Amino acid sequence: MFVVYAHRGASEYAPENTMSSFQLGVHMGANGIETDVRRTKDGVLVLFHDGDFKRVIGCEGCIADYTYEELMQFHVKNEKTDTKDIIVKFEDFLRYLGFRDLHFAIELKEDLAEETIALLDRYNMKDKAIITSFKFDYIKRVKELRPDWRIGYLVKEVTEEILSDLASIGGEQLCPQAKYVTAENVEAWHGMGYNVRAWGVANFDLMKNAYDCGVDGMTVNFPDQLISYMVKKQ
């Protein structure tokens, strides 16, 4: 099954990593959601991508500077909307969406394997979720804690070293940047037994190419456009 992962929700149209964005992605027909996990000053896991607040909140600071309650004063911005969306607690996300028939890609932005697995276990997410990161040590730690959990390695261009590292921990998903995806590479990666998910799909041409090359899933800010293209190709 091809998985359309709404990247931080339908983040082209709504403030990223907010309930509005996740809901819109599902409404558009995405069968997967991708999101990012960080930890607050008081140890609460929340969904936030950036290492600081400048881009999406518009001020100085970062998640680790504040308790969860203190974070409620901030609103996540998107230039296409004027909604006042708050930063989402990871557990609230799982409570609201975890029971749905969706795939979940949970990216570790910090070394949070143990805490993330504990919450996912609480909501019976093992068969629905894959834990991913650009940091190899983070996904390696997931496998050390729970070898039965699926992990994905987010990379730019795939190298022999990356393939060797992923194989060494029994990883399931290889996540190359879309601009490096070719049909030949996808075929080779499939031959190695990997599920292939493209990320960094910045425009329609990259989206079209990745889909046509045979990837198994894609992380996109505009799930409606990918779904429309898939329908046309059928």
PLM regions: where:
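Phosphate-group recognition and catalysis centered on beta-loop-alpha active-site segments
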Residues: 1-234
